[in-house]
Amino acid sequence: MAYVFLGVLIILQQLDREVSGRVALADGLKGKKLLLVEDNALNRELAQEILKEAGFAVDTAEDGEIAVQKMKQAAPGQYDLILMDIQMPRMDGYEATRQIRALPDAAKAGIPIFAMTANAFEEDRQNALKAGMDGHIAKPLDIPHLLQVLTDVLK
């Protein structure tokens, strides 16, 4: 448990340095609402904390099935972007993306969806695109890269 705490502390210290060096990020993106879909509780908590520290509003789902339900029930414009894990119980990220893309509400169906996964081979990137995702962010997270991708997409 001490190792996990130390890891969280190191990540948050890195985040503090990254975010303080990117004040413009917070100004332009503060309050943007993300849906973070991640089955691993520790990964979910870490990513949520990183994103909140950067100024995002973050809602979470533990698997693809819950993510699809949240999108079906979401008010128009409730979410600006989805960060989707791939390997999850009940419904994986590929199937969840396909179901979100098939929603009758064009705004919900067209939301930017990025794979956020340890599956980092070119084949994995291509599978994400084929499923309808807009891009791929590899884990472990490179915080500056993650924040840059979010900035580029949400501006």
Residue ranges of model-derived segments:
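C-terminal compact regulatory domains
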Residues: 1-155
